[in-house]
Amino acid sequence: MRALEPEDLELLYTIENDPEVWDVTAIGAPCSRYALKQYVASQQTLGECDQLRLVVALRDNSRAIVIVDLSAYDAIDRRAEMGIWLLRAERGKGYGAAALSLLEDYARDRLRLHSLLARSATEGNDAALALFRSAGYEQAGTLKDWHYSKGKYSDMALFQKIFGE
């Protein structure tokens, strides 16, 4: 797991502009390479902007395939929200679970966070729901009719993982 680099622009562009991602997240609109290039160039620390975006790359060839985010960071309560996005061709290979484990280790051990919150649309996002459940996240609540996609509203599940002291 590492910080975003300029060479990650195509990964970011592919994920941010994937309509399947729009269907289950709040992204919902195309993003230009120019805007993403500016975003990568302006990366700040988690404490400066309450968001940290990292990349997970394969060990054998260093090819970046996963983006993980920490956002809504609260240093006092030691919590953050997290997100995870995989390239479509890399789904179903265990990379999501591995990336989530790396992010949790970083959040717990380096940032000393007490808890992580994950949101997942309940329709069309079965893999994410299964990932969070298998990683020990508890469903802490449901936001009714929270996400609009393909002409209808769906619920948003809230998952929380609390780390031991």
Regions found by a protein language model. Give the residues of each.
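Accessory recognition modules or surfaces
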Residues: K93, E104, L117, G151-K161
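PDZ/PDZ-like domain micro-motif
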Residues: E90, H147-Y148
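GNAT-family acyltransferases
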Residues: M1-A89, Y153-S154, K161-G164
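Conserved acetyl-CoA-binding loop of GNAT-fold acetyltransferases
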Residues: R133-L143
